[in-house]
């Protein structure tokens, strides 16, 4: 990890900017995770309450996967200060990414495949048999396909553990229904392990089948678009890590263009730093660098943007107004709750 406010050479700065601004991949470390503290604490609260589980949902691009990624380091960090040493010793935090072809059993097999037992203690990660490890499913003598009761019995022996299923919106409806049954069962038996479901959805009902039957057993975490001050934290973090300074005008411009979506803050922030390097103006980043960044970001996604524009405006009717309507939407003053 680079020291705070360390000055880098221009070439190093252009390279290191990509370690702080990460538009292509979700954030995976707590020190680069900005905003969403309230939502993260809500997940931690669910972990600390037996029988309670969490569902993280919202539109695409608001940072759901990044939030899911920092659950593990946050929980493990809190363990250092928590009083429940027994749970902390046995706790594991495991994540998998669901696919459209996944069943209830295949998802849990993927989660359990990462866990081995050594001297009756769960350990996450690949290791050789020489270490005396025993795969979790082998230790419990459970065969595929796994049932709700199979999973319940295993989780009962992993107190305080967290199992995260990302992209849950992709699973078949039948799989979603079985997860609802599992959460209800875990709650009824007060099993002290937490299931966290993450997916793209406007409402929890679109993501979790028959959610009304488990409403008391789930903490519903809707990820709204980020507030301007939360997006500004991303830029503040970059300033400390890279030793650069965004002018107030540049920072406000980036935040406004991002429209609450952290992906764009990372994307424009990255190219702004590199634009400043090319202009020979680091560590100061001004509005001109932001405009150059927009040109570069647009250039890199030009073909996909053209394709989306073509699909949105195509019509067999000459009098269709799709193009001017789309242009009007683009130039209209954007507000957080604006229908546009």
Where do the model's predicted regions map?
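A short, basic N-terminal segment
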Residues: 1-54, 73-79, 84-86
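Winged-helix-like regulatory helical subdomains adjacent to P-loop NTPase cores
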Residues: 269-340
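Conserved small helical "lid"/interfacial subdomain of P-loop NTPases
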Residues: 223-250, 263, 268
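C-terminal helical "lid" of AAA+/P-loop NTPase domains
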Residues: 252-256, 263-278
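Short regulatory helix/loop adjacent to the ATP-binding pocket of P-loop NTPases
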Residues: 203-218
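Conserved catalytic/switch belt of AAA+ P-loop NTPases
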Residues: 179-190
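Short conserved motifs of the RecA-like P-loop NTPase core
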Residues: 180, 245-257
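P-loop NTPase nucleotide-binding core
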Residues: 45-177, 191-194, 201-203
């Amino acid at each position: 990890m680079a020291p705070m406010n360390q000055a880098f050479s221009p070439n190093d700065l252009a390279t290191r900017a990509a370690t702080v601004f990460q538009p292509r991949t979700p954030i995976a470390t707590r020190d680069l995770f900005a905003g969403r503290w309230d939502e993260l604490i809500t997940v931690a609260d669910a972990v600390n309450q037996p029988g309670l589980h969490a569902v993280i949902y919202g539109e695409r691009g608001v940072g759901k996967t990044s939030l899911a990624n920092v659950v593990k380091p946050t929980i493990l960090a809190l363990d250092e200060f928590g009083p429940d040493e027994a749970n902390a010793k046995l706790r594991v935090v495991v994540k998998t990414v669901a696919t459209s072809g996944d069943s209830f059993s295949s998802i849990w097999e993927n989660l359990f495949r990462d866990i081995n037992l050594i001297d009756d203690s769960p350990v996450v990660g690949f290791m050789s048999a020489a270490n005396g490890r025993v795969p979790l499913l082998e230790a419990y003598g459970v065969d595929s396909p796994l049932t709700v009761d199979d999973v319940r019995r295993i989780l009962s022996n992993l107190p305080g553990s967290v199992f995260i299923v990302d992209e849950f919106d992709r699973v078949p409806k039948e799989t979603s229904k079985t997860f609802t049954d599992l959460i209800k069962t875990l709650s009824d038996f007060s099993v002290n392990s937490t299931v966290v479901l993450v997916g793209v959805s406007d409402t929890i009902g679109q993501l979790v089948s028959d959610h009304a039957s488990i409403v008391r057993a789930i903490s519903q975490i809707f990820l709204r678009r980020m507030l301007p001050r939360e997006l500004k934290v991303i830029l503040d973090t970059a300033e400390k890590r890279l030793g650069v300074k965004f002018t107030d005008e540049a920072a406000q411009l980036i935040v406004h263009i991002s429209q609450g979506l952290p992906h764009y803050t990372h994307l424009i922030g990255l190219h702004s730093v590199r634009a400043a390097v090319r202009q020979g103006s680091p560590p100061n980043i001004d509005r001109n660098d932001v405009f150059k960044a927009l040109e570069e970001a647009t250039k890199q996604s030009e073909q996909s943007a053209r394709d989306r524009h073509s699909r949105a405006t195509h019509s067999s009717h000459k009098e269709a107004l799709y193009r001017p309507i789309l242009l009007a939407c683009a130039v209209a003053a954007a507000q957080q709750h604006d229908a546009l």
